[in-house]
């Protein structure tokens, strides 16, 4: 099916995620936190939604943008780098991308960087002129080189990019970097950022207009509730009225304080949602400012 052909009416939503790799487990955990559960097929590539009519496809990450563009899947969790690479390649071929990033999902952060042999005296991007750059992201790199006004050769490799300079097939590389350990092991050093990336929920530009529309809206609302509270804690305590302003100043990253019904002990009962780290040091600071009976609770989900 071409990207311009309307997808057939369906009453079940389909989501594609990476079968194996660094995004697989976080993606599945996020969807499970949204209330989804599945029955796995024998080939372990298709998971039938049991709690809701939302099915899961387990595929290679570089297949996900195409599955969305062709209407096979409605959504996918994939790296922004993979999404941009295929969108750029489609534009260069005169095709519409037909998909976009709907939400960042808070994991899979990495950087696409240029890396050169350690012995290079890096002076800046002007050194790239006439050089051969190995990468698995040729379209992103070509776009970046054009923006920099640099004429260099792009050597496309599907894997083991970091070994290309030692093999003599390239002078330097453009590859994803997380910790930098792989670069160091291959006597390379990162020198220039090409793009920041993270995992995103991707969807078709044209949203479904059939029964899937309500499922999509519900899923996005649930996901927002999970993501908003992922690093948040519910903080509950008692305090005298005269200490409330000082306590509020110690909670700049928290929602407004909410007063709960009086428990008969004279002090106010208060609670708030903290969106930053609630450390022992922070609790002790609040205690010194007059907070009593401090409790920190984990919140899994919310409907705002």
UniProtKB/Swiss-Prot annotation:
<keyword id="KW-0328">Glycosyltransferase</keyword>
<dbReference type="InterPro" id="IPR001348">
    <property type="entry name" value="ATP_PRibTrfase_HisG"/>
</dbReference>
<dbReference type="InterPro" id="IPR013115">
    <property type="entry name" value="HisG_C"/>
</dbReference>
<keyword id="KW-0547">Nucleotide-binding</keyword>
<dbReference type="GO" id="GO:0005524">
    <property type="term" value="F:ATP binding"/>
</dbReference>
<dbReference type="InterPro" id="IPR013820">
    <property type="entry name" value="ATP_PRibTrfase_cat"/>
</dbReference>
<keyword id="KW-0808">Transferase</keyword>
<comment type="similarity">
    <text>Belongs to the ATP phosphoribosyltransferase family. Long subfamily.</text>
</comment>
<keyword id="KW-0963">Cytoplasm</keyword>
<keyword id="KW-0067">ATP-binding</keyword>
<protein>
    <recommendedName>
        <fullName>ATP phosphoribosyltransferase</fullName>
        <ecNumber>2.4.2.17</ecNumber>
    </recommendedName>
</protein>
<comment type="pathway">
    <text>Amino-acid biosynthesis; L-histidine biosynthesis; L-histidine from 5-phospho-alpha-D-ribose 1-diphosphate: step 1/9.</text>
</comment>
<dbReference type="InterPro" id="IPR020621">
    <property type="entry name" value="ATP-PRT_HisG_long"/>
</dbReference>
<keyword id="KW-0460">Magnesium</keyword>
<dbReference type="InterPro" id="IPR015867">
    <property type="entry name" value="N-reg_PII/ATP_PRibTrfase_C"/>
</dbReference>
<comment type="function">
    <text>Catalyzes the condensation of ATP and 5-phosphoribose 1-diphosphate to form N'-(5'-phosphoribosyl)-ATP (PR-ATP). Has a crucial role in the pathway because the rate of histidine biosynthesis seems to be controlled primarily by regulation of HisG enzymatic activity.</text>
</comment>
<dbReference type="GO" id="GO:0003879">
    <property type="term" value="F:ATP phosphoribosyltransferase activity"/>
</dbReference>
<dbReference type="Pfam" id="PF01634">
    <property type="entry name" value="HisG"/>
</dbReference>
<keyword id="KW-0028">Amino-acid biosynthesis</keyword>
<keyword id="KW-0368">Histidine biosynthesis</keyword>
<dbReference type="GO" id="GO:0005737">
    <property type="term" value="C:cytoplasm"/>
</dbReference>
<dbReference type="InterPro" id="IPR018198">
    <property type="entry name" value="ATP_PRibTrfase_CS"/>
</dbReference>
<dbReference type="GO" id="GO:0000287">
    <property type="term" value="F:magnesium ion binding"/>
</dbReference>
<dbReference type="GO" id="GO:0000105">
    <property type="term" value="P:L-histidine biosynthetic process"/>
</dbReference>
<keyword id="KW-0479">Metal-binding</keyword>
